[in-house]
């Protein structure tokens, strides 16, 4: 009896949390179908009648949605590949090799996670301006070619604790020796053994990086001044005028902007959940 009551309470709490999390999405979709008068109506309109689907068409045309989506896709995919690959290599080096100053470097890496990236914005902007890289995606990619501290730490922890822990019941030396006997070099061990076995964590890292790049406004707004080069998150700002804001179009554009990320998550949900579970188990 006591267990059944606790079970019911658990589901009630989960249901309430789900409602709290879904309300913003409902309000976003509802707002994307409103006109200006419905936005300012009192009491608020939750189910707009009539529904103004023209907000989606107007947003698509006014902000150059197709070009902006392509820009975001190119930037997000390139950023994800660079960060995941470089972070995985750095994590492999920290977790597998012994070299002078290793612990000091790793402590510096952890300390750098505590610093806001915005403090380097002005020096980086001045440097990239002298290199004539403004209005390209290079300033948003080059600083991350050596890996992002958080993802280096995440992948390193996976390699150290899970990969060489209870998963394979073998020491790193034994695994490496077996691979070397088969003729594998250091990079071959990484690509053919460590990489595939770290797939769940790599996918989690890739998803987090893709989402960050997709929604980035700070760096995109600083380095991409030309409208034809701007990503979708920056183009949304063009709907904010000096005297008015096109709320309906902005909400409609936000809904369309979210769809690729939601689709990506559902396609990779299995690996994402597995990677999160592994991270928790460590």
Where are these regions (language model features)?
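A structural signal for multi-pass alpha-helical bundles of membrane permease subunits
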Residues: 2-282
